[in-house]
C-alpha cells in the first residue's frame, strides 16, 4: 500500500511557468511555502482539479487523480478546499452550512462526524446563528468545518488566515493546532507566513518562481544555510522535547532536550508528554563554557556544524547540533573570531527565549 502523495505539473501561461514535481507524506500538514507570485495558489488549484495544467500527474496514496490519459474532475476528487475568504451560504444557518456537503456523502463514505467537528472547532454556541453575524475568525472556523464534513481524503487550505486581523488569527490558530493533531487526513497548507508554517506544518515544499526549490521535513529546511529560511530576520528551528517536571515555585516547566534541560513558562501537561519548541536564531548566543552567573538560565551543550555568512555581512548564522536536531544562532562575526569558534567545536548555547508550539 502506498501512503505517499506524489505530484508533478507543468504549465506555461503568459509570462509565468510552473514546473514542479514532489513527494510528500500521506499524513500530517505539508506547507506550500514561498513569496507572493511563486505559484502556491496555482499549484493548489491544479491539485484540486479546478484548473488543468498542460502536463500533470497526481496520485493520492493508492488513488490516481491525474495522469497522461486520466483526469478526475474536481467534483469526483474526495477533497476539501478552504479559501482565503470563507464562501458560506448567507441564507443558511451555521449548522446547515456545516451539513451542506456532509448530507451529500453516502453514509458508508463518511469518515468525520458532525459532533466531532463541532467539538474540535468549538462551534456549539454558533450552530443556530446566521453566518452574516459571525466574526471573520468564526466564519473561517465554519468554512473549515464544512470542508471536513465532506469526508475528504485530502484537505487543501489556501492562506486561510490571510484575510483575518491579528486578533482573529490568534483566535483561530489554536483550533488549527488541535484539528491537525486529531485529523487522519493529509493537509496541503498554502502560506507565505513563516510563523504559520513553523507552528502548523511538519513537512515543507518551498516554491520559488514556479519551481520546487526544496522539500522535506520542516526543521531540515528551516536550518539549511543554502535556503532563505535560515537567513530571515525571524529565522528559527523547531525542536522536539519532553516534559520532565513542573516547577510550581517559579511557574515554569522543565523540558528535556538532548544534552540538557530547558525551562519555559508553565505549560499544562503530564510528565513525559512530547512537545515542540521554536527557538529563534537571534535568541541563541554562544559560550566556550557555561557562565557561572547569568540571567540566561537555559544553557545546553552543542556542536558547531558550520558557520555561514548572513544577509547582514557583520553577522553569521551558526548551525548547531543538539543531539540529532539542529538549531541556529545568529551572532556577530567579531564574536566568532574573538572566541575562535570553528566548525566541529563543542560549545554552549545560551538560549534567551523558547516558544512552545504545542
Curated annotation (Swiss-Prot):
This chain's function reads: Part of the ABC transporter complex ModABC involved in molybdenum import. Responsible for energy coupling to the transport system.
EC number of the protein:
7.3.2.5
Q: Mind telling me which PROSITE patterns this protein's record contains?
A: ABC_TRANSPORTER_1, ABC_TRANSPORTER_2, MODC, MOP
Give the UniProt keywords, A-Z: ATP-binding, Cell inner membrane, Cell membrane, Membrane, Molybdenum, Nucleotide-binding, Translocase, Transport
Species this chain originates from = Hahella chejuensis (strain KCTC 2396)
Key word Repeat present:
no
Protein name from the UniProt record: Molybdenum import ATP-binding protein ModC
Alphabetically, the GO molecular function entries are:
ABC-type molybdate transporter activity; ATP binding; ATP hydrolysis activity
Topology of the protein relative to the lipid bilayer: Peripheral membrane protein
Per UniProt, residues of the Mop domain are 293-358
GO CC term, one of those recorded: plasma membrane
Q: Please list the reactions this protein catalyses.
A: molybdate(out) + ATP + H2O = molybdate(in) + ADP + phosphate + H(+)
Say which domain of life the source belongs to: Bacteria
The record lists ATP as bound by: 34-41
Family, similarity comment = Belongs to the ABC transporter superfamily. Molybdate importer (TC 3.A.1.8) family.
Localization recorded for this chain is: Cell inner membrane
Domain ABC transporter positions = 2-234
Alphabetized SUPFAM superfamilies for the sequence: MOP-like (SSF50331), P-loop containing nucleoside triphosphate hydrolases (SSF52540)
Gene that encodes the chain: modC
